[in-house]
């Protein structure tokens, strides 16, 4: 969607991880049906937001190519040691022109097309700081999905302080703020590739 003068929500693709369970490859650039995983996600995330950011600590030129159709900006962590998704989130919160950031990992090609709208509705209804997706399976088992979230960029300074103190756990930081959980019944929409086996399984779905 075209970016208005004052965008309300920035979309943040988290593609800055180490992918240690995949031999250190750049996970977002791995192919699913001939298309990089990151591009699958961008095609679903970008139409839901007003501006698009890609957190990438490697292969910035390649991500710039993938993000060009969405006018995406490439950003990198402020620290060089791959401290996890919170570092990418902080970089996105500081780079965003919008007051809200919706984040997603780069390896979830079936991302819900209504993800951001549902997170925004819950955030506003509860006057929360963070809205986080939670999947619910057929047995009613709830599984938090902390890297699928909508956050206020005003939390950036607190996040920076926690990272400086050595904190790396996403849900522990969320617990410091008013967080609302948003239930999604379609588990498939949140399937990702943390291993070569899981990437192969995605191709079969």
Enumerate the predicted regions with their spans.
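Nucleotide and nucleotide-moiety/phosphate-recognizing core
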Residues: 2-167, 172-191, 196-201
């Amino acid at each position: 969607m075209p970016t208005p003068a004052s965008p309300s929500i920035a979309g943040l693709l988290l593609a800055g991880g180490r992918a240690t369970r995949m031999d250190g490859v750049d996970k977002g650039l791995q192919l699913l049906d001939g298309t990089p995983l990151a591009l699958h996600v961008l095609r679903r995330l970008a139409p839901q937001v007003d501006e698009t950011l890609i957190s990438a600590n490697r292969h910035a030129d390649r991500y710039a190519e993938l993000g060009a159709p969405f006018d995406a900006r490439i950003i990198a962590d402020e620290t060089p040691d791959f401290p996890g998704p919170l570092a990418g989130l902080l970089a996105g919160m500081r780079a965003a022109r919008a007051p809200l950031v919706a984040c997603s990992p780069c390896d979830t090609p079936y991302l819900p097309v209504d993800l951001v709208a549902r997170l925004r509705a819950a955030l506003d209804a509860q006057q929360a700081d963070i809205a986080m997706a939670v999947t619910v399976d057929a047995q009613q088992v709830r599984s938090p999905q902390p890297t699928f979230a909508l956050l206020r960029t005003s939390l950036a300074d607190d996040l920076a302080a926690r990272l400086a103190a050595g904190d790396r756990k996403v849900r522990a930081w969320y617990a410091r703020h008013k967080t609302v959980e948003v239930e999604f019944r379609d588990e498939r929409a949140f399937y990702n590739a943390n291993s070569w086996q899981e990437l192969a399984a995605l191709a079969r779905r």
